[in-house]
Every structure is written in structure tokens, then in C-alpha cells.
Amino acid sequence: MNELDILQLFYDEMKNRSATRDQVFLNMEEEAAAMLSQKLGQSVSVADLQKLTDICIANEWLERTTADPNYKYLSLTEAGLQVILANQYS
């Protein structure tokens, strides 16, 4: 598992909802860890998920949309969308 798997969660949700990146907000907690575990076929802990989420936030690929310092209501940035698109179409 790596940062691209985190970004892919956001992109998949955008496609599922037919929504733009600024309309999709995800929480990187138990539910997201369970979704990634199922998708990747391996156990993903919340701690590992949040560690990679921190890297995505530091790289400005994800952003917090509220004053909540935790992992709720995160949004994909334009830079994050470019990273996932470049990875998919290269």
C-alpha cells in the first residue's frame, strides 16, 4: 500500500458519484481502512492509513476542509488529482 492507494479512494468516489474533486469529502478512519483492505486483499490498519494520509497532506495532495485536526472531511486537491491521473494514464 502507498500514497497512490489513498488518492485512488478519492478518485474512485468521484467517479462513483459523477462528482468533481471539490464535491467529495472522505474520512480516513475505520471505514476507509476496511475499504482499502477489501480492495487490496490485505489487512490495512487505521494507523497505516493515517500515516500515508499525513504524507498526502504534507505533499498537498489532500487537504483538510474543516478546523478538525483529525482525519475527517478530507478533500483531494488539484495537485492530488493530477498525481492520480498521471499515474493512471502513463
Describe the residue ranges of each PLM region.
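A short, conserved structural fragment
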Residues: I57-A67
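Charge-rich, solvent-exposed alpha-helical interaction surfaces
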Residues: I6-L9, E13, M35, K39, ...
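Short amphipathic alpha-helical interaction segments
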Residues: Q42-A58, Y71
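Short, surface-exposed loop/turn segments at secondary-structure junctions
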Residues: D22, A67-N70
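Short helix-coil junctions and helix-kink-helix linkers
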Residues: N27-V46
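Short, amphipathic alpha-helical interaction segments positioned at domain boundaries
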Residues: K72, E78-S90
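Short alpha-helical segments that sit at the start of domains
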Residues: M1-D22
